[in-house]
Amino acid sequence: MLMISILYSLFPPLLFPSLLAAFGASIAGGIVGSYIVVKRIVSISGSIAHSILGGVGIALWLQYQFDLPISPLHGAIASAIFVAICIGNVHLKYHEREDSIISMIWSIGMAVGMLCISKLPSFNSDLADFLFGNILWVTSRDLYFLGILDLLIVATVSICHTRFLALCFDEKYMALNRYSIKAWYFLLLILTAITTVVLMYVMGVILMLSMLVLPVSIACRFSYKMSSIIFTASILNICCSFLGIILAYILDLPVGPIIAILMGIAYSLSLLLKRSCNTSTPSPVSPESKINS
């Protein structure tokens, strides 16, 4: 309630739904993005993110062609989870061909989405919204659904944080404690899939990786502790998202590209700041960090 009161007092009421959606997406991106960067599965998350367009396109086409009560958000979540499971199987069973198969899934997902969207009467408008984001027009129904997804992400990570750390740093630890590495890996990919859907409304399909990766990369330059990285990345996401929404509203420009540019500027400034401190740049997170940190 305090956050809602602050948003109402600081920003125009018209922007409140967009800012609320951006706040939830920023938290999700900061949390899950930290595990993605540390586990070094950015390319896998990129494939999941871009394959979402296939589910969005199919949902829009079914909605237009057969008047079915299916929203693009439903299509996005279904395709994201499906692709995450497919890529997880590829990673675990066909590691030597992983890059080629992931690239194929990435390409097919986007191709299917673009073909379906091309059959819609408002091709250019819809394609731009889902490629580059259009959070300024988020509906209350979408906001509730995004809130549920965000709560699911936060609750899961709060319960499973130690297991995810073990998965990222020490799989032998998991094996010795008889935890299923495969099951936890799939859970992380599914969380990544859900997060990409949440970020789709802020950044669009093409630019959402900047919200997953860049804030975490900035945070990793100044901290070794996972909890600090998650907190810093989430704050950076919130700041860049809020500023991007306000600038987009004032300048009448797409939100996603502005946020991506702000993220890039923040990353460049972090490089300069780190260099000015004359300290060596740390690796994303030290393997010697405690598993329960």
UniProtKB/Swiss-Prot annotation:
Question: Where is this protein chiefly located?
Answer: membrane
Q: Which UniProt keywords apply?
A: Cell inner membrane, Cell membrane, Membrane, Transmembrane, Transmembrane helix, Transport
Pfam families xref list:
ABC-3
The UniProt entry, under CDD domains, shows:
TM_ABC_iron-siderophores_like
Name the PANTHER family on file: ABC-TRANSPORTER METAL-BINDING PROTEIN (PTHR30477), METAL TRANSPORT SYSTEM MEMBRANE PROTEIN CT_417-RELATED (PTHR30477:SF18)
Q: Where in the cell is it found?
A: Cell inner membrane
Q: Where are the transmembrane segments?
A: 18-38, 41-61, 68-88, 101-121, 142-162, 186-206, 242-262
Q: Does the keyword Cell inner membrane apply?
A: yes
What this protein is reported to do is described as: Part of an ATP-driven transport system TC_0696/TC_0697/TC_0698 for a metal.
Query: How does the record classify its membrane topology?
Result: Multi-pass membrane protein
From the Swiss-Prot or TrEMBL record, give the protein name: Probable metal transport system membrane protein TC_0698
The family annotation for this protein states: Belongs to the ABC-3 integral membrane protein family.
Note the superkingdom of the native organism: Bacteria
One GO cellular component, as annotated: ATP-binding cassette (ABC) transporter complex
Query: Which GO biological process annotations does it have?
Result: response to zinc ion; transmembrane transport
Keyword check for Hydrolase = no
